[in-house]
């Protein structure tokens, strides 16, 4: 999954022969144990102008200065909603650093 690779890069994991994980090993989309450290890092890198919020059956990233990013998730899975919000946050964060 390309989104798992995106998350791994955000977490500074390298998909090289030197890494203990291969891309196919990334479990961000299926495991809270993998995903929660990402949520914690997002909380650390967020500034006073960014709000990262996840609600059951809905997740969104709010950039107070510029715009809102809403991710509508039609699922009863909190893991999936969180995963999609994390991916959108990272994509938005990457655009800001360009």
Write out the residue ranges for each language-model feature:
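Glycine-rich anion-binding surface patch
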Residues: 1-98
